[in-house]
């Protein structure tokens, strides 16, 4: 019982923080659509949303979300110690821990997720362009990778489900 409450609390926080940082479920679903439309004729937006919801319901995904967003928020407030403060605040390209954390999300649905993640990280469509816009004054060093990873994992899930139907 107590364990259930704790789990709900983590999911609530993860979803609340995504929203507060400017990311809606439909923004991530748009990325899934972008990744999958060429492989599934008649792909529906509601299927993309449903798969994002499934990914968001996983505890390991929620853990990655609250950890990454927490670090972004603290960096934005200048509350981390050096050298980590500067590394995260400036999104230093050699840091790489943001991507490692995102891999824990991509991993949930197997290896095809990595291809999707790499592709979307290069293209930066939709919400990813917004999250990478440094002129907003926001620190999204972790969040951009997390959002790309959720989209990649949801795409893998959708592809697996479609393969099972065929
Ligand atoms: Mg990053």
Language model: regions and residue ranges:
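Plant-biased recognition of short, low-complexity, intrinsically disordered N-terminal tails
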Residues: 1-6
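N-terminal interaction modules that seed assembly of large macromolecular complexes
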Residues: 7-72
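Long, charge-patterned amphipathic interaction tracts in eukaryotic proteins
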Residues: 47-122
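Short, hydrophobic/amphipathic alpha-helical patches that form generic packing surfaces
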Residues: 30-34, 67-68, 101-111, 145-155
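A generic structural micro-environment signature
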Residues: 24, 29-31, 62, 75-77, ...
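Glycine-rich, aromatic-bearing surface loops/beta-hairpins
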Residues: 113-166
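Generic detector of leucine side chains in alpha-helical contexts
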Residues: 18, 31, 35, 43, ...
């Amino acid at each position: 019982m107590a364990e259930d409450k704790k789990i709900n609390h983590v999911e609530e926080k993860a979803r609340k923080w995504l929203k507060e940082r400017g990311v809606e479920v439909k923004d991530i679903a748009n990325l899934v659509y972008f990744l999958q439309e060429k492989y599934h004729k008649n792909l529906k937006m509601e299927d993309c949303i449903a798969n994002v919801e499934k990914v968001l319901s996983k505890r390991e995904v929620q853990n990655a979300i609250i950890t990454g967003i927490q670090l972004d928020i603290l960096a934005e407030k200048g509350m981390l110690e050096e050298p980590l403060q500067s590394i995260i605040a400036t999104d230093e390209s050699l840091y790489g821990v943001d991507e490692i954390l995102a891999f824990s999300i991509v991993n949930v649905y197997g290896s095809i997720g990595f291809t999707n993640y790499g592709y979307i990280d290069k293209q930066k469509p939709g919400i990813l362009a917004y999250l990478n816009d440094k002129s907003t004054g926001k620190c999204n060093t972790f969040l951009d990778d997390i959002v790309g990873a959720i989209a990649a994992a949801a795409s893998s899930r959708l592809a697996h489900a479609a393969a099972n139907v065929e």
